Amino acid sequence: WDMWARKYVMLGFTYYIEICKNQALKRKIVRALKRHADYIMKKVGKGRGKTDVCLTSGVYGGMNSCSILEPFVKLYELTDDKKYLDFAGYIVSTGFSKDFNLYEACLNKTAYPYQFKHTKAYEMMSCFEGLLEYYKVIGDENYLTAVKNFVDMVLETDYTLIGCSGCTHELFDNSSVKQTEYSDGVMQETCVTVTFMKLLTKLYAVTGDSKYIDYIEKSGYNALFGAVNNEKQTMKRTLGIVWK
């Protein structure tokens, strides 16, 4: 999970820059981001002595690592240094997994997300967030089509009545149907709700299609607000055993 964690360090800095009014601090943050990214590129990628990004994680085919795409695109936008965009392009070329090309599957709609080799919902959504950012810079309509198809397929097969996904832990599992089956297990992760709302927000900003806003509203008022703990409840680890 090293690359996954590094992604959020970089995103945290990147989004903070947008609201930071201290110009000296902003320059310092950009320098830190560049050092962070340069170190990653020295160790990860194609070439002798480097590790393929999909092999930097032992789970989910490396989808979690590939989701670092988004901050590399944003760093390119901050610096105009093409090496960061090139690294982003390398990540896209992997298809976001060592043994299944998510990009091509969504571009051509050959399978639904719950039918993919790896079905971890949050991480998969994060990869397509990055792909949308990459599209905004590159302009290749195939990338936008793949993101739109991904979202449409999630809405068709893995979007529940309350506006979340995954009735098997944190995995896509055709939950549009599976939600009708009784279960007292862990399901419909709030991280999935929030990440999908983020992706829908970005897709609306790019396309202007108001249908994405409708789904944001559904997820927000139901899955997200319903998950807020306003009664100071405690929980036994991740087993879902809740008491006051």
What are these regions (language model features)?
Residues W1-K244:
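Glycan-recognition and catalytic cores of secretory/periplasmic carbohydrate-active enzymes
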